[in-house]
Design a protein with these regions (language model features):
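Alpha-helical transmembrane segments and their immediate interhelical/interface regions
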Residues: 35-50, 158-184, 223-251, 333-335, ...
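A late C-terminal transmembrane helix in Major Facilitator Superfamily
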Residues: 405-417
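C-terminal TM-helix exit segments that contain a strictly Trp-centered aromatic cap at the helix terminus
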Residues: 86, 90-91, 95, 211-217, ...
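Membrane-embedded alpha-helical segments and adjacent helix-loop junctions characteristic
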Residues: 59-149, 302-389
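Alpha-helical transmembrane segments in multi-pass membrane proteins
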Residues: 20, 24, 43, 47, ...
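Juxtamembrane and boundary regions of transmembrane helices in multi-pass small-molecule transporters
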Residues: 33, 171-174, 183-234, 393, ...
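Hydrophobic transmembrane alpha-helices that form the pore/transport pathway of multi-pass ion
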Residues: 111-203, 366-407, 432
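Hydrophobic transmembrane alpha-helices of multi-pass small-molecule transporters
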Residues: 1-82, 199-207, 216-324, 476-494
Length: 494
C-alpha cells in the first residue's frame, strides 16, 4: 500500500467513486459477452482514464494519479519478472527432459481414476513445503497438465485440481508471502493466523478432494485412450533422456524455495540448470537454447497431441499475460491513489452491523478488490488496514479478519483472469482463450477449494461459528448476538 501524500484532498463520494468501477465492469461485460472478445486490456486502460478524470475532478494532479499507477506496477515488478523467468524455465525444462520425465513417470505411477485427487494433494504438499503457489504451478503443475492430457482429462479439470492444491498449500504455509502479509497487516501472529484458518481450510479441502475422487472414478480409459498413453510414453522415451540428470533442475529449485531463496533467483537458477542439461544431453548450442528461452521449445514427435503439449514456453508466450497484468494493476493503482477504493470501503463499513456484517464484508471486500485492482497484495492490505480498527472496537480478535482477507485474497486471486494470480495460471498452464471458446476458463469453477473456503467463511460469519473474541484463546462455535456492541462471553467454546 502506498502512502497518501495529499491528505487535504477529500475522499470522493460513493457515487463518484463507483463511476470508474461500474463503467469498466460494464465495458468488460459488453466486450466479452456481447462481442465475444476476451481481450480486456483496452477496457482496463479506459477504466484507468475514467479514474484519472474522477481524480482530476477532486483536485488530483496527473502526476499524482500517474504515481499511483507506477507505484503499484513497481510493487508488482517481482511478479512480472517471475512470469518472464517462468516462461524461460518452462521452455528449457522441456528441452532438458525435466517436464517430459515427470510426465512419463506420472503416466507409469498414477491411475486415471484418482489423478485429479492426487494432483490436488501433490500440489498442496509441494506448495505448503516451499510456500509458493506460482513455483508449484510452473513446475509440478505443468507436468500434471501433461499427464492429464495423456489420460484424456480436459485441461480445465486438471488445471482446477492444480490450482486448488497449489493456492491452498500457499494459503497455510508459514513460508508464503501472502500468509505473512495477512498476519502482518492485521497485527497477528502468523502461526495463530494459520491455526485460525483450519475451520475453513479443512472442510473446503475435504469437499474438493471428494469431488475430484468422484469425478475421477467415472473416468473410463478405453482402447483408444490406452493407445494414446502408449504413444505419449513412446514419444517421450524416444526423444528425451528419462534418467536422473533431468531431475537436477527440479530438485535444486525445490531446495532453494524450501530455504526461502527469493522466487526470481531460484527460478532463474532452474532455468540455467535446465539450459545446461539440455546442452549436455542433446547437444543444443547456445543460440538454440536462447531461442527456446525467448520463443519457446519446438519439437515434432509424430504425435500431434504430445507436440501441442511440449511446444510451449518462452518469454513471448507470457507477453499477453504480462500486458494484461500491467493494465489491471495501473487501473487498481489509480483507484487506490484517488481514494475511490477507500470511499467504497468506508461506505460499506458504515452499513455493517455486528460480527456477521463485519466478517462477511471483509471477505467480500477482499474479493472485490481482487477483481477491481488485479492485485492480490492490495486485496489483503486494503481491507486489513481499514477493517482492523472496527474489529478491535467491537471486541473481536483480528484473527477473524486475517482469515477473512486470506480467503478473499489469496484463494480468489487465481480465479480472476486479469488478476496477477489468474494471469499467471492461464499463461503458465497454456489455458488458451480464443473468441467463441472460453472452455479453458472452466478451471475457475472447477478449482473447488479456492471458492469453497470463502463461501464456508461467509457461512461461519452468518452463524457466528468460529468467531474469536479479542480476549479469548479459543473460538466460538455458537452464533453471535448482533445487537450487543460490548464484548460478551461466548458459550460453547472448543
Amino acid at each position: 500500500m502506498q502512502k497518501d501524500n495529499t491528505p487535504n484532498l477529500a475522499i470522493p463520494s460513493l457515487g463518484l467513486a463507483l463511476i470508474p468501477i461500474i463503467l469498466t465492469i460494464a465495458l468488460l461485460g459488453v466486450q466479452i459477452f456481447y462481442y465475444d472478445d476476451f481481450t480486456p486490456h483496452i477496457a482496463l486502460a479506459i477504466g484507468f482514464a475514467i479514474t484519472a478524470l474522477v481524480g482530476w475532478s477532486q483536485g488530483y494532479r496527473w502526476k499524482d494519479i500517474e504515481s499511483g499507477a507506477f507505484h503499484v506496477l513497481h510493487v508488482a515488478m517481482p511478479s512480472i519478472a517471475t512470469l518472464i523467468v517462468v516462461g524461460m524455465l518452462v521452455s528449457t525444462w522441456i528441452a532438458s527432459g525435466t517436464v517430459p520425465m515427470l510426465i512419463f513417470y506420472g503416466l507409469e505411477l498414477i491411475d486415471p481414476s484418482w489423478f485429479l485427487a492426487a494432483s490436488m494433494l501433490l500440489c498442496s504438499v509441494v506448495s505448503l513445503s516451499i510456500g509458493s503457489s506460482w513455483t508449484t504451478v510452473g513446475t509440478v503443475g505443468l507436468a500434471l497438465i501433461g499427464i492429464g492430457s495423456a489420460f484424456g482429462v480436459p485441461i480445465y479439470w486438471s488445471a482446477g485440481a492444480v490450482v486448488s492444491g497449489a493456492f491452498f498449500g500457499d494459503k497455510i504455509s508459514p513460508l508464503s508471502d501472502t500468509t505473512n502479509l495477512a498476519a502482518a497487516v492485521t497485527e497477528t501472529n502468523v502461526f495463530d493466523h494459520i491455526r485460525n484458518m483450519m475451520p475453513t481450510t479443512i472442510p473446503a479441502m475435504v469437499i474438493a478432494f471428494v469431488i475430484y475422487l468422484i469425478v475421477g472414478g467415472q473416468t473410463d480409459v478405453d482402447t483408444a485412450q490406452l493407445a494414446q498413453i502408449a504413444q505419449f510414453k513412446e514419444g517421450l522415451s524416444s526423444h528425451f533422456d528419462l534418467g536422473i540428470l533431468p531431475l537436477i533442475p527440479l530438485i535444486v529449485v525445490m531446495a532453494l524455495a524450501f530455504f526461502k531463496v527469493s522466487p526470481i533467483p531460484a527460478l532463474f537458477t532452474g532455468f540455467i540448470l535446465g539450459a545446461i542439461v539440455a546442452a549436455v544431453n542433446y547437444d543444443y548450442n547456445l543460440n538454440q537454447v536462447l531461442t527456446f528461452a525467448h520463443s519457446g521449445f519446438k519439437i515434432s514427435t509424430d504425435t500431434a497431441s504430445l507436440d501441442s503439449l511440449l511446444n510451449r514456453g518462452g518469454v513471448s508466450s507470457m507477453t499477453w499475460v504480462i500486458t494484461l497484468m500491467m493494465f489491471a494493476l495501473a487501473f487498481g493503482g489509480a483507484l487506490e491513489r484517488t481514494r475511490c477504493l477507500e470511499s467504497v470501503v468506508r461506505s460499506i463499513l458504515r452499513l455493517t452491523k455486528g460480527f456477521r456484517g463485519l466478517q462477511t464484508s471483509a471477505i467480500l471486500t477482499s474479493v472485490a478488490t481482487n477483481v477491481v485492482s488485479g492485485d492480490v497484495y492490495l486485496s489483503i492490505a486494503l481491507p486489513g488496514r481499514m477493517y482492523g480498527p472496527e474489529y478491535s472496537k467491537h471486541g473481536y480478535s483480528r484473527l477473524n479478519l486475517s482469515r477473512a482477507i486470506e480467503e478473499g485474497g489469496t484463494l480468489v486471486s487465481p480465479l480472476i483472469p486479469w488478476n496477477a494470480g489468474g494471469a499467471f495460471v492461464i499463461g503458465t498452464l497454456g489455458l488458451t482463450v480464443v473468441s467463441g471458446d472460453y472452455s479453458a476458463l472452466l478451471y475457475i469453477p472447477l478449482a473447488f477449494a479456492c471458492w469453497l473456503s470463502p463461501v464456508i467463511g461467509i457461512i461461519y460469519a452468518q452463524t457466528g461459528w468460529f468467531s474469536k473474541r479479542s480476549d479469548e484463546d479459543v473460538m466460538s462455535t455458537q452464533p453471535d448476538s448482533e445487537n450487543s456492541s460490548q464484548p460478551q462471553s461466548l458459550k460453547g467454546n472448543i
